Design a protein with these regions (language model features):
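Short, C-terminally biased terminal segments at protein or domain edges
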Residues: 1-118
Length: 118
C-alpha cells in the first residue's frame, strides 16, 4: 500500500477532477449556490476525501470500504452533472469533459479496489 494518500494516482486524479468541477460550477446560476452547485461540489470533494481517509486506516478492509464510498460519490456526481446539463446550467461539451474525468477516476478507483487483497 502507498505510504501516503498523496502518492495514490486515484487521489491525484480525483483532486484534478474536483478542480475541474469547481470551475464548471462557477458558471451555474447563483440561485443554485445552495442547491445543485453545492451538491455537485460536495460529491466531487467526497471522492478524494474518502480515498485519503481510507488509506489512513492502514487496513485493506477499511480502505476498500472507503474506496467504495468514493465510487458511490462518483455515481452521484455523474447523475448531478447530467442533470445540470438537462437544466441548461452547462453545455454538453463542458459536461462531457467533466464526465470523462469522472469515468477516468472511476476506472482507476475500480482498479485500486480490485488490487487490494480480501
Amino acid at each position: 500500500m502507498a505510504q501516503h494518500f498523496k502518492d495514490l494516482v486515484a487521489w491525484q486524479k480525483a483532486m484534478d477532477m474536483v478542480t475541474e468541477i469547481y470551475k464548471l460550477t462557477d458558471s451555474f446560476p447563483k440561485r443554485e449556490v445552495y442547491s445543485l452547485t453545492d451538491q455537485i461540489r460536495r460529491a466531487a470533494v467526497s471522492v478524494p476525501s474518502n480515498i485519503a481517509e481510507g488509506q489512513a486506516h492502514y487496513s485493506h478492509r477499511e480502505f476498500r470500504h472507503f474506496l467504495r464510498h468514493s465510487a458511490g460519490s462518483l455515481a452521484e456526481l455523474e447523475t448531478q452533472l447530467l442533470l445540470a446539463e438537462r437544466l441548461g446550467y452547462a453545455d454538453h461539451p463542458s459536461t462531457e469533459g467533466s464526465l470523462q474525468r469522472v469515468h477516468e477516476v472511476g476506472r482507476i478507483l475500480n482498479g485500486l479496489i480490485a488490487s487490494l487483497p480480501e
